[in-house]
Amino acid sequence: LREAFEAAVHRQLMTDVPYGVLLSGGLDSSLVAAVAARYARHRIEDGDKTEAWWPRLHSFAIGLKGSPDLAAAQVAADYLGTVHHGFEYTFEEGLDALPEVIRHIETYDVTSIRASTPMFLLARRIKAMGVKMVLSGEGSDEIFGGYLYFHKAPNAREFHEELVRKLDGLNNYDCLRANKSMMAWGVEPRVPFLDREFMDVAMAFDAKYKMVDKASGGAQRMEKGILRAAFDGYLPDEILWRQKEQFSDGVGY
């Protein structure tokens, strides 16, 4: 699983423009950043033979003042050694952006708007820095059952069926929202967790190993335990075992 994800991130780094990673300090974005940081010194395009234009990975986070994501992202960035850019925004900025956000994401769905607003504001700042592509942690929750309601799955078969249902709908919800809110400013988001070859590996695992078993005392005591265990040592425990938060909650509203 680890090797497949490392290869997926490596493939997604194929680019001839300045790039970075979205880093909320949660498990998914931190894993993407951790792997990308290992490859950032060299150009993927020529088989890692020459140094990259930006030999240090740049990471980006946004939130209201004092938000959990800003604090957690800084911890992860310090550990990984990225050039980190943590941006704060105000309620007023969020409210002012709503008409543009709704126009770009083309929906009045409240959940989509909540998640898109900080991403839209972050994309504007990223584009102003000349960055044109970012890696994101989207897709992990759908592959590994990261949403808290997966705790209630009665058995492995129904757990897996719900994973498939969530993945089938990604193009209409999370991925569509992320693409529209970022591309509004010409920033391309890429999602290594949804790399086809990685998904072939991840979805081949028996769903029982993805389910939460709080009584086990092992990795499965928390959602996405199989993923956390695979990357043991990549991140500090406070990040590797951080509880899942919605993006809109993590940025502080």
Task: Show where each model-derived region lies.
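Hydrophobic, amphipathic alpha-helical faces that serve as interaction scaffolds
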Residues: 240, 244-253
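ATP-dependent adenylate-handling active sites, centered on carboxylate activation for C-N bond formation
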Residues: 1-235, 249-252
